[in-house]
């Protein structure tokens, strides 16, 4: 059965957060964000596991799904609702073997070949990007624009999550290009009021 993914996919990047991850997760989940991913490339595995367990608990209180970035082992041990892997991380099927059938496994793609390869896996959703220029990642991939979303939409029935440089001002055109969800990091994490910003995304999504 095809996954129905929320219109807004929040990414809490440790380098962007203005306040603690736990407080931000609670604010986002209470605002109605249905899926929250935590990304911290510098934290130790032990601390990532500890953080993830607490974030699982926080998200569960509000009915949100928590996703771990990169680490299926941590996701499984923490009882997270999913893991997101990149092109250099463990393959989707290996992540699935670690996390189980009930866990979401998502994968990042940056071109048509990768989208086609992802379609042939058990990935629950396919992330496509970066759609717009972004400074969130130190070594960002080349901007793919809305055109790759349109092409990917014709290539797969899996949910598409657009990522990269997405703001509340340009989110609508991304959804209308064929994305089921927009993954947002900086525009939420760096916001003075992440919950208010999240509610604005959700308000705009409700008018599609």
List the predicted regions and their residue ranges.
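Hydrophobic alpha-helix-in-membranes signature
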Residues: 129-132, 158
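A short, flexible beta-alpha/helix-coil linker loop
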Residues: 41, 132-134
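Glycine/threonine-rich flexible loop motifs
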Residues: 136-138
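Conserved N-terminal beta1-alpha1 strand-loop-helix module at the mouth
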Residues: 1-90, 97-124, 141-144, 151-160, ...
